[in-house]
Structures are given as C-alpha cells and as structure tokens.
Amino acid sequence: MNVKDAIEKVAAEYPLHPAIKIPQRYGLNNVHYKTISFEALRDCVGKLSTYLFGQGIAHGDKVLVMVPPGEDLLVLIFSLLNIEAIPTIIDPGMGVRNFLNCAKKTQPKVLVGCPKVRYLLPFLSLSVRTLRKKIILTRSLKKQLETKGFVCNLQKHCNLDSPAAIVFTSGSTGYPKGALYTYRQLNAQVEALQKAFNFQPDEVDLPLLPIFSLFNPILKMTTVVPEMDPSHPSTLNPAYIVEAIHRCHVTNIFGSPRLWTYIADYCESKQIMLPSLKRAFLAGAPVHPLLLKRVQDLLPSGEVYTPYGATEALPVACISAKEVMEETYAQTLQGGGTCVGFPLSNVRIRIIPITELPLTTLPDPLPVHSVGEIIVQASYVSEVYINDLPAIKKAKIVADGIVWHRMGDLGYLDEKGRLWFCGRKAECVVANSGKIYYTECCEAIFNACPEVFRSALISYRQGSTTSPAIVIEPKIMPMRGKDKKILLEHIQQWSKQCMLTCDIEKFFLHKNFPVDVRHNAKIHRLKLARYFQKL
C-alpha cells in the first residue's frame, strides 16, 4: 500500500473502525477516551490538505512539523504526504540550540505548529532564513476547517522516488542528522514491518515513541495516544500506561528499556498482568536480558521482542525474549555482547574492518565471530542526509549502484547468522597497548554485580596515555567517603574475574548517568568521559 493513499483506502475498507483514541483525564482516576474513526481521520486529512495547498504549500516543499503526538500529528503528516510536501520531524527534546541547528540545515519553507511553539518563532525567523510561512493550528482554525467543508481535489504526482519525509537522528554520539526517505522507501518499510510481525486490522497500538504512531493508520491499527510528555519521557506515569493497556485492550506497544523498567516495576508491585498484549517491543538502547524476562512474565499471551535498527535503517534485525533467555544470555554475561537476532527478510548485513575513513568501495566481510563495523542494506534504508555531504560520505558506501549504510555500531555475526551488538564505534576505547575495549561487552560484566544499577566504559586520558575506565551508577549511592572507597574496591575485584576487564584500573562512581532524551536509555558515555577527564 502506498503511504500517500493509505488513509483513503483504509477508510474505505474500515470506515467506522477507531483510528485514534485520545485520553482526556478528569482527575486522578477518571479518564475518557475520545475516539476518531478512520472515516473521520480521512475527512480531517482531506480538509487540512486542501487548506495547506491553498496556503501555497505544494509538491517538494519542506515543512517543519511542530505539533504534539496524537490526532494533530497524524492528520498533519498525512495531509503533507497527500500534497507531496515533505514533513520534517525533529525530536522536541534535543534542546533549543540543536533544534534550531537542525531546522537551519533542513532549510524548510513552511512551519506548521501548535500554539505552544509561538515562543520559538522569533528564534526560528533569525536562524532559518528560508522560512516563508508560519501556520499555527489554533482552535479557531481547526473549527474553520470543520465547518467550511473544504474538498480535497489535488493532483497526484505518484513519483515513488520523490522525497517523502525527513527524520532527524537523536545525535547521541555525534550531531543530529536528517535522514531523507522517499515514498518507495516508506512503502518498503511498512511492508517489512507487516511481513515480520503480521499485524492485524483489529489491533490496538500504544506507541511510547510518537514517531511510530505514523505507521499505524497504514497498518490498519488503532493508535492510543499515551499520557506522557514525549520531550521528557522520564516523567512517564506507569499507572496511566497500564490503565490504557487494560481500558483500550492494547495488543501492541513500543517503548525504551528505561520506560519498560518503570512499567515492570509498577506491574510487579501491584501484581498486575497485561493479558491483552500480543507484542511488546523494547528498543532504543541495549536491553538487559533480565528486563526482557520481567516483561515477558507480564504477558501470558504475548511475545517480547527487541528489534535492532537506527533512524536511517529500521528494522534491521530482531530477537525474542525467549530466544535471548534460552540461547544467548549466558554468552552476554561472559562479555560476548548482546545478540539482536537474525536479519529481517531482504536485509543484508556485513561486518567490515573498523575504520573512521570514508569508503568508496565495499570492503570484504570479516570472518564469523570477528568484531567489526556493522553495515546494512535494504530497500527501506535511507540513502542520504539532507544538506550534509560530509555525513553522507562518512556513513554511506555505494557499490554497484546499491547504497549500504554504516550503522556506526560494532558487532559480529555468529555461525547461525545472528547479529551480536558490541557497542557504538565512537564509544569503544583503544588503549595505548592496542587492545580494543567494547562498551557492551565490558559493561555486561559489571552490570551483573549486585550493587550496580548500570555501568559505562569510558576513555580516560593522562598525558599521552589512553586507558579504559569504568563508571558505576550504584543502585544505592554510598554517602560516606569510606563506603564509596569500599564499593570501588569491590568493583575492582569484580573486574578481575574476566579476561576482558581484568586489566582495567580506573573506576569512578556517578549518581545519575546522562542519557538521551528520545529514549531516556542511551548512556552519554562521551559526556561522562569529558566530566571525569576534568576532575
């Protein structure tokens, strides 16, 4: 199904089927769900499409999208696709400076936002010289669209290789980059998701990462808007999420490991199960096998999965909690990395020698079990970044007219063809001795220590000497200096049990690790390294 025509076709097939359920809370224990059918969603998209077209927004115009998740986001995105304008999606939690830099790089012609973004308009006008029009979706404008009966009668260009959307990366180990997707790539992405997970038209999805809600209308699924602030996911109230799962009979849910930790803690404390869930996806950062098991125990009729991918390439691989616990967990505990499963159908994965240099030819693959750089190729992998030639040269390899994407990750393939993740390339530590330390492999050793909540491998420099160091976030931070010293000595002794970590000599404690805003789970190891380098 073409993403452009999806709403129209789904509305014709399932006109009264709920497309969106929006929570409206009245007090702590009283929530009502406003329901919008696919037929109503189609009408909203048609009216807004016609209005935007009448405002001069046309084929190929880049449009900066600044609306909250839910009804407004879905209607706006599909309206822009309908007139073949290019929605530009930037993470609202990355901070004003990063946001403005992303907007400036994109060079959008139009901004469409909610009333709350008015405070940013002066900054945007100064930073983004290409902006010619700013449209605020006020209540009065929405009312006007409802009552005036706009009719959408737009010419369809139907060029599948035209730009369809720009989605920015989180920039957790660099700077945010705008991945450009064509209609052909978006269509292929939807087909890959459907083939891998067999979503059914009567299913209900609760996406804790807003961008994933955009696939639901195309997959004929109902979207339940979560009660949370997407720019501050750590403020999530797990009680509200569990209530939504039960009230709306949610069958599908996506969330980061940190958010799932909140949900699992809540469910276990209240002895609550989640029987309606068929699938729970944990992604956005490496997932501890014990968390996978905890979530699986909450789903008597469902499966827990951890997919692997990136903003530029999703999905790449996937593994179930059951396979992790039965086949790969023991190797992870021994420092073997995290298994992220078999590549999805029609996805090619290759492990190549590690290098920081741009590549103009496709390197030969490394042998099985050899750690190297992960590169991937699929019909839905984004091939370019918007207005960023240096990033394109660094992240893309063109071979025989086919574009491979360098994931920026390190890992290896095992004898069965499964992919194992060993960490980000930018975060591995190369010691003066030449030995390479991988974050995912080393941290697994320390994360098994009873006193440790999580750990981070960082590069520590003293003069011309580079060595690995481990930062520990304890479950309970000792208050007294004496107790901190005892804990660090215990951690140092713990490191001696494994060949991977026995020669690490620097250890630090940190109360709260800095993490990314999008998933609230990816550790900012480079930021930690800068912090301890200054001490």
Residue ranges and their predicted role:
Residues N82-L145, P474-R480, Q493:
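Structural core segment of the AMP-binding/adenylate-forming
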Residues T35-E39, A164-E191, T222:
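Conserved AMP-binding A3 loop
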Residues P15-P18, G149-G171, Y175, N198-V204:
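Conserved pre-ATP/AMP-binding loop-to-beta segment of ANL
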Residues I86, N187-V204, L209-N252, Y266:
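Conserved AMP-binding/adenylation subdomain of ANL enzymes
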Residues I20-G70, L74-F78, G95-L100, H157, ...:
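Conserved AMP-binding/adenylate-forming core of the ANL superfamily
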Residues M221, N252-F254, D265-G335, R348:
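Gly/Ser/Thr-rich phosphate-binding loop
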Residues A456-R461, A469-I470, Q492-L535:
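Conserved C-terminal "lid"/linker of ANL adenylate-forming enzymes
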Residues D364-H369, E373-N432:
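Conserved ATP-binding/catalytic segment of the ANL
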